């Protein structure tokens, strides 16, 4: 004989569910907005209309531009975030996020105007998120662009507790007549290399594999700081010194050295038939890259196509302008070297070779 189904517990059914019960804390989101407003406020610049919190962010292109062309870029920080989780170090990845996009749009001559961020997590930790956004705001200050908006997505079940993902979006402007596209690069031009601050934000899947193999003490001293701090050093932002250089020197082309290293990024600004011949003796290989190569048994060719190997930005100028450009960049605090020359390609030759 079938037993009658039990009636729902009247106490359970009377108690309604809330968004918090589902894992989304609206109050935490509001607290984060309040916490980050002072950071965003410090990035405000001419062109910003309104503040944080609206449905859309408004920006007026500065009147100094006669024929402005908008240049946009988007990027993330990649698996460097996994190392940040492991080390519980969240104060520098925000600068990484900004750098990856503003350095990209800079190579076409664009001045970064504004930036937006996307922070996604499973459970929002206000302290961690605020630390990340503070770093984003600092990166915007270094770039001269405004942090005018963003999105914080708390999505239960999508990410493990304590983990998050980031995406950033930069928009800049350049005069139409001053777009840098590499079309004027010619044989005899010089390739200048601007020093990186470390690994930047590419190659971290290999970095993590090397760490797994070598099992180093990440807190041990490494070249004057902990190995952890050396690995997590934030991506250098080249915006202000290079915008100043463009006012005084005819910059023919630039390449942000990201995934693919020198050998895959410099060709992106070279027309067919040209090769950048780089001399590996032209700049010092930083100790961190030597450490990675040694402990990972990484071949030279693989190093050059995965890591920046100490060069975060390549700049192409005429031979006549090279010394002046080095002087201006050095005066602005950059380390810079002549790392190569442009020549005609041999038959079947790659567009960037390291000798």
Curated annotation (Swiss-Prot):
GO BP, one example?
'de novo' IMP biosynthetic process
Q: What is its EC number?
A: 6.3.3.1
- Please give the chief subcellular localization of this protein: cytoplasm
Q: According to the lineage, what is the superkingdom?
A: Bacteria
Q: Which Pfam families match?
A: AIRS, AIRS_C
What this protein catalyses is: 2-formamido-N(1)-(5-O-phospho-beta-D-ribosyl)acetamidine + ATP = 5-amino-1-(5-phospho-beta-D-ribosyl)imidazole + ADP + phosphate + H(+)
GO MF terms, alphabetically ordered: ATP binding; phosphoribosylamine-glycine ligase activity; phosphoribosylformylglycinamidine cyclo-ligase activity
* Database matches in InterPro entries: PurM-like_C_dom, PurM-like_C_sf, PurM-like_N, PurM-like_N_sf, PurM_cligase
Q: Which UniProt keywords apply?
A: ATP-binding, Cytoplasm, Ligase, Nucleotide-binding, Purine biosynthesis
Statement: the UniProt record of this protein carries the keyword ATP-binding = yes
Query: In which pathway does this enzyme or protein participate?
Result: Purine metabolism; IMP biosynthesis via de novo pathway; 5-amino-1-(5-phospho-D-ribosyl)imidazole from N(2)-formyl-N(1)-(5-phospho-D-ribosyl)glycinamide: step 2/2
Q: Which PANTHER family match?
A: TRIFUNCTIONAL PURINE BIOSYNTHETIC PROTEIN ADENOSINE-3 (PTHR10520:SF12), TRIFUNCTIONAL PURINE BIOSYNTHETIC PROTEIN ADENOSINE-3-RELATED (PTHR10520)
The text of the family note is: Belongs to the AIR synthase family.
The protein's matches in NCBIfam families, at most eight in alphabetical order, are given as: purM (TIGR00878)
Q: What is this protein called?
A: Phosphoribosylformylglycinamidine cyclo-ligase
């Amino acid at each position: 004989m079938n037993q009658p189904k039990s009636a729902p517990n009247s106490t359970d059914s009377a108690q309604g569910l809330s968004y918090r019960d589902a894992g989304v804390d609206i109050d935490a989101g509001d607290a984060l907005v309040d916490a980050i407003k002072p950071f965003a406020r410090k990035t405000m610049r001419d062109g910003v209309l309104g503040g944080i919190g609206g449905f859309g962010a408004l920006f007026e292109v500065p009147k100094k531009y006669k024929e402005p062309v908008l240049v946009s870029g988007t990027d993330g920080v990649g698996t460097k975030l996994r190392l940040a989780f492991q080390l519980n170090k969240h104060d520098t990845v925000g600068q990484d996020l900004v750098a990856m996009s503003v350095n990209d749009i800079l190579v076409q001559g664009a001045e970064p105007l504004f930036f937006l961020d996307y922070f996604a997590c499973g459970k929002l930790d206000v302290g961690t998120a605020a630390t990340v956004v503070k770093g984003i705001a600092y990166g915007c200050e270094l770039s001269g662009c405004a942090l005018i908006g963003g999105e914080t997505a708390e999505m239960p079940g999508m990410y493990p507790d304590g983990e998050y993902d980031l995406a950033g979006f930069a928009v800049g402007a350049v005069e139409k007549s001053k777009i840098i596209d590499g079309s004027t690069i010619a044989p005899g031009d010089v390739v200048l290399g601007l020093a990186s601050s470390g690994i930047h934000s590419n190659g971290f899947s290999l970095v993590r594999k090397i760490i797994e193999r070598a099992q180093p003490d990440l807190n041990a001293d490494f070249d004057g700081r902990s190995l952890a701090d050396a690995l997590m050093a934030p991506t250098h932002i080249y915006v202000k010194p290079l915008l100043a250089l463009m006012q005084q020197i005819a910059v023919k082309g630039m390449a942000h050295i990201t995934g693919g290293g020198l050998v895959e990024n410099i060709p992106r600004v070279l027309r067919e038939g040209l090769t950048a011949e780089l001399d590996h003796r032209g700049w010092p290989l930083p100790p961190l890259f030597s450490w990675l190569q040694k402990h990972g048994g990484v071949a030279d060719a693989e190093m050059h196509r995965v890591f920046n190997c100490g060069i975060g930005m390549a700049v192409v100028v005429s031979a006549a302008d090279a010394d002046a450009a080095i002087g201006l960049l050095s005066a602005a605090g950059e380390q810079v070297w002549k790392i190569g020359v442009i020549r005609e390609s041999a038959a079947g030759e790659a567009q960037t070779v390291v000798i």
